[in-house]
């Protein structure tokens, strides 16, 4: 198949746009977790989200109920000032499975203050995103 330079550039531009969109969506998802924003989190996730993470003890968790539990935990005492938390992705890498599905892998960095000292925690995450009815949805996560 012969593709013109314009076709190739248009495809590359579309992939770059989709990559930026997915990274932005994933960042919003991560921020919703640290902010306890269930509405944003659940809007970005498929209702049949699956995951492997430390909290599942090696068992595949299916659905949003598992995640909802953590959002519903009581916040810190009101007498304590909120501790700022920053979450970011180091070296995000996207592997396209199809135009409507992608695997996003990165190291998640979480920065916060503990007892007056800045602390950075890291973990490796792989998230699968799928475009469902024209909207990108988070469908699987594996965290270690």
Where are these predicted regions, by residue range?
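A short, structured loop/turn motif at beta-sheet edges
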Residues: 94-103, 116-117, 129-135
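Short beta-strand edge/turn micro-motifs at domain boundaries
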Residues: 2-3, 120-144
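Short, cysteine-centered beta-strand-loop-beta hairpins and adjacent loop/turn segments enriched
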Residues: 111-119
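Hydrophobic/aromatic beta-strand elements that line small-molecule binding cavities or substrate pockets
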Residues: 29, 67-70, 89-95, 107-110, ...
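Short, low-complexity N-terminal intrinsically disordered segments enriched in polar/charged residues
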Residues: 1-47, 52
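A solvent-exposed, acidic/Ser-Thr-rich amphipathic alpha-helical stretch
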Residues: 19-20, 38-100, 119
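Short beta-strand segments enriched in hydrophobic/aromatic residues
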Residues: 45-46, 108-110, 142-143
């Amino acid at each position: 198949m012969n593709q013109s330079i314009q076709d190739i550039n248009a495809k590359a531009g579309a992939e770059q746009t989709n990559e930026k969109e997915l990274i932005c969506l994933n960042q919003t998802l991560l921020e919703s977790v640290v902010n306890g924003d269930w509405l944003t989190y659940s809007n970005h996730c498929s209702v049949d989200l699956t995951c492997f993470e430390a909290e599942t003890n090696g068992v595949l968790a299916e659905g949003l109920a598992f995640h909802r539990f953590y959002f519903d935990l009581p916040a810190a005492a009101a007498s304590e000032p909120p501790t700022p938390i920053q979450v970011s992705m180091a070296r995000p890498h996207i592997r396209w499975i199809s135009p409507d599905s992608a695997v996003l892998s990165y190291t998640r960095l979480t920065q916060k203050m503990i007892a007056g000292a800045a602390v950075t925690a890291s973990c490796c995450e792989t998230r699968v995103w799928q475009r469902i009815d024209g909207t990108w949805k988070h469908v699987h996560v594996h965290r270690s």
